[in-house]
Amino acid sequence: IGKDTLEVLEKNKVDCACMKGLRCCGMPAWEQGDLETLRVNAQHNLEILIPFVEKGSKVLVINPTCSMMMRREYTELLDGEDRERAKKLSEAVNDPSEYLWNIRNEDRFNTDVNSMPNEKISYHAPCHLRAQGIGFKGRDLIKKITGSNVKTVMECCGHDGTYAMKVEGFDASKRIGQKSFDGMKSEESEVWATDCPLAALQFKQHAGVKPKHPMSILAEAYR
């Protein structure tokens, strides 16, 4: 997904760089009540990213859980100077589809595709992306660039961070996600899409189809 994202950004003349040394956003630690690890990771990430933010760079975050942490939770979970830096980071964080949607009226926005995905695509809207209030930009980009008919499924897949990875949460997560599994299947689409890699694992395990990330669908269309 990372390589596909870089390919799509390059096709749209976005000057980008991958930063070395970044740590986990801290969500798994937070879910276990380990606030110390969360704060250490957050402070480390701020040290790396803030110099670029202060120069005007955006921070594109592929995983919706990670972007939610950096955009919404760091500002609540950190104190003092770290909180002020977290506010700067929050304003700079974008989902890749969100960033590309925001430049759709610029000359560099690229709709010149060499292949088309299937006419009908089932798109799952991840909970952690919806929580950021940015709309469904992955879906909208696929529609705008490829012209595909994209059907949206809103129900939670049940993964919920690390919840579905635990023995005690596995069966419950499947029950919670059943409506989303049924919704994706009901469209009878050959291609499924979601912005969340964890949701993709949940669909693969319980519905038999692994959705593609919107960036992967677009990268294939550009090739």
Give the ranges of each region predicted by the language model.
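Iron-sulfur cluster-binding electron-transfer modules in prokaryotic oxidoreductases
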Residues: 1-223
